[in-house]
Amino acid sequence: MPIWGAISSNDLLNTYYTIEESQQIVEELLDFQMHNDQLEYFDSIEDAKKRFITDLYEILEKKHQKTNTFQIVSPPSAGKNFFIETVLAFYWNTGVIQNFNRYNNFPLMEAVNRRVNYWDEPNFEPDATETLKKLFAGTSLKATVKFQKEANVQKTPVIITANYDKFTKEVWDDRIIKYYWYPCPKLKEYNKRLHPFAWVYLIDKYVTDLLILIKMYNHRVMGNKICNLIKMYKYRVMVINIFSAFICLILIFLTNNYLGPGLYTCKSIDETTLSEAVVIWPSDKVTNHKEVFQADKQARDEFFTSFVHIGNVHSLIGGIGLGTKNLVEEHVLGKPLYGMGKRKSTEKDWAKIKRINRARAARRENQENQPDIREFGHVAGQNINADQEVNLADFPDFLQDFDAEAGPSGTQPVETAQQSPPTMSEDIQPMETVGATDTGGGAQVDPRTGGQAAGGSEMGAGGSANDGREDIFSGAPQPNQHHTLVYGKSYHFTITKWFTEFRHLATTNSGYYAQQRFKHIHGIPWERLLMYVSEGELLRMFRDYTSLKVEEVVCEVYSLGVRLPFVTSATTSSVANANAQYPIDVFHFDEAYETNYGINNVADIINKALGTEWKNATRPTAPVTTAWSEQFPNISASSTSRDINNPVIVDYSLPYFENNVPKDVGIYDYVDIKNGTTAYGKCWEKRFKPTNGLLYAESTLKGNVVTPLAAPTNIMTPIPGLENGYFMSNDQIRERRDLTTSVPPDALTATKLNQSASNNLNAFVDYMGYNYFGEQKAPQSMPKFMIGFVNIRNEDNSLLNAKWDILIKTRIRLTGLQSTREWVARTDRIPPQYFTSQYTQFRYPNINDTPLLRSLGTFKLPTKRPGMDSRIALGELQKQRKMNL
């Protein structure tokens, strides 16, 4: 038995794993690395592994005319060298390619007369491109050897491992087969090398279709002895053919078996009686008998050549079998023993290989350059490149243990109707400079610019504009700064269940309603900004930015298991089995029905998320050190968990004096159900891009008084970016060709001047709005995230109680506009980058109308049904108003 890289035969097991251990480890490694390729290009991981091993095998056995190189690209600790060194050890005669640079005149010196050449972390100068093209294509070339004459490098397979792909141009696609691997944490557990015979195992399993009568006898020493014996004969081919025929006759008469492709039905030969096997090698792409004979001879010679050079007993067995087959067919029968049949072509689709290589490279580049916001921990925000566009839909998912949220069609896509405009940029809309001034018109001029209009294309003598990364000179107007901010939070909650309730509600303004409240379905208030940021982060954003806009949010639900009651004394007739599979589910029937939930329940969840029950509720008037306590104001940490109690309400409008009622809500038409007993880890995910995610913006459309309705300016100001020419004056907004007027929209819900502690804490990710000025935009808003149970009853109709532990993980991406000079944009007007298309979302007929007040009622809670308010009793609404005041 060879010792390969071991110090001695006694040290072999200290250096290499056993063959069985190596087989298991290499399968685990390939399962991990082929998983990503399987998701994109193959039907299963087995197909991906088969393609990988086949590609490597065909390169090593020189099966391709032009493609002669196999490359694995990966970051460190991916296992590429761990795997490739095993393959190279199997072939023994391995050469090393050195880097091509001015300091090395003999890069191919060690690559002459080798079975396979290896190049780790390649680096080369452009002058070596033509040489490498020949080397990678298997074309013969000359190599300079130190202190010797030039040598000839024949077609020799090349194996490359690299951390970065240096061969990205199209010229290499026909010469190199590339695979991209990923860091494998489990490699840290392995302290030995893989046994080289693991490569034989992989070939037998994933490449060869040979009919093996018994297990191949792996012994290189015996193979070398047989090789030397055969070399002694002058006519070794004739001797081998005679010996092959003799072995074949013995096998046929002793076992009474028929050897043929696709017809092998005999029992296995006893391994104790024979140590060798006859193997049938099928020929490919032949059209007549003569080509069959020629293909068999060629394959036979390749087997014997392999045996002579590397002592592979498998090759000897294959050569013997093919020699016997050819002798009988050509000289006895005169025709192939098994018929022609249809042989599968091994011609490769190079166009597809190019596409796969490019897709793998693009995916790897995207993975390296685009961070997934779900992987961030507790961060205070991240200032990314101002012009960088972040698209979460393009990011790879590393947590796919469970399916994403599914609807009736099986998938729940990102809300494409909610696509926001591109990330803020100076190129979207130039700063409006021709507007009203205190003289009634004309360009805005600042003396520090040397007489030029602020924000104009040319700067005056006072200084020159820059991109914000250069020195700031006195008097030079600076461009706005756009920052991308990423925040994230994680929460541990529990969900309980109860029966559904109903009632009739007489409202004061919109008629008569019937309501259902599903107490086993609860809403996650992911529309609230404070589910993503802390109070301090929110205040810092309001302090640091002129205006702020939500670009995208992500909310994930992880299941920690459903806890069922432990029944000890009840009978089976009254209580269901405590080990029952309790279903958990996510609902999205808000697509078809008007839904809402109570603002007090939402406030309770937000308080628990912020920790106000222990930070603020019991804080004394004077600073004092208190004793440790387990009794929290809202929950008892020693006995119960943090419940989400936010049942979803469905509203049905009922006409007066009519008895007909609308259809009952089909909640199970819009549900994705999982087994709560076995579902652990990530269960569902929702992503959303707000239509109107503007949190606030400073504006001079308001006075200096912080009131619910600040006094507008007396200056007529055009709304920038609107083609129809809307104008604002003292108390009116009007269109140039329309006499209809109304109170000017002071952007109350999104104006920094009007921020207060109460409405800051009630900020929403998306403010739905309805256009009143003819814009062709469908009213849309943020969908609800509703999770819960399917109720299970006992035989006596009582409810089988359960408690569901969940983790909620949220991430938010915002863009902030920071004006660098007050006279440029900070207090001049609403920044046009936001309001070119979104400004009409704030045009309500009456600015004093309740929907604009953030902290009142539940009418701002998301619904996909336009024109529907929350139906709260008048007394509850008045009580809520008093609390806010």
From Swiss-Prot:
Main location: host cell
Xref: SUPFAM superfamilies: P-loop containing nucleoside triphosphate hydrolases (SSF52540), ssDNA viruses (SSF88645)
Biased composition (Polar residues): 409-423
Catalytic activities: ATP + H2O = ADP + phosphate + H(+)
Biased composition (Gly residues): 452-465
Top-level taxon of origin: Viruses
EC number(s) on file: 3.1.21.-, 3.6.4.12
Transmembrane segments: none
Segments for region (Disordered): 404-477
One of the GO BP terms on file: viral DNA genome replication
Keywords: ATP-binding, Covalent protein-DNA linkage, DNA replication, DNA-binding, Endonuclease, Helicase, Host nucleus, Hydrolase, Magnesium, Metal-binding, Nuclease, Nucleotide-binding, Transcription, Transcription regulation, Viral DNA replication, Viral genome packaging, Viral release from host cell
Annotated compartments: Host nucleus
Alphabetized Gene3D superfamilies for the sequence: P-loop containing nucleotide triphosphate hydrolases (3.40.50.300)
Domain notes: In the N-terminus, the endonuclease region is involved in binding to the origin of replication. In the middle, there are the ATPase and helicase activities. The C-terminus probably contains a transactivation domain.
Function (record text): Multifunctional protein which displays endonuclease and helicase activities required for initiating and directing viral DNA replication. Also plays a role in viral packaging and transactivation of several promoters. Binds site-specifically to 2-3 approximate tandem copies within the origins of replication (Ori), unwinds this hairpin region and nicks one DNA strand thereby initiating the rolling circle replication (RCR).
Name of this chain's protein: Initiator protein NS1
